[in-house]
Amino acid sequence: MLDKPCIDHRIYTIRLRKMNEFLDVFDRLAMPVLLETLGTPLGFYTSHVGPQNQFVHLWAYESLADYERRSRLRDTHPDFPAYLAASEHLIVAQETRLIRAVDLASIKHLWRPEGYGRQ
């Protein structure tokens, strides 16, 4: 079980044949800001089966208030507009979902104490 129960599950749909360009822009311009303001991510993924050209990232938060506080830090960071401008033409759609962890007794023994993955 994750120690931060609120997860930002974000999905970007990227223009056809532009994923590599998007990943470069994201890594160079967004990641420094995100690491500084949001902290360590849970992971990054691209779609393999199902809808294509999608980039997914997951960030964990203590609460909705923690999500809102760190999101404000990101949105007001002086370097963040450069990423927004550089990526605007690459993104077709964005979905942002806040999902909550479910604590199931039947699988508690599968998770490490620090909460990030199976033993």
Regions found by a protein language model. Name each.
Residues 2, 24-42, 62-99:
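An amphipathic, aromatic/His-enriched active-site/gating alpha helix that lines ligand/cofactor pockets
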Residues 6-13, 45-75, 95-97, 110-116:
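Short, well-ordered beta-strand segments in beta-rich or mixed alpha/beta enzyme
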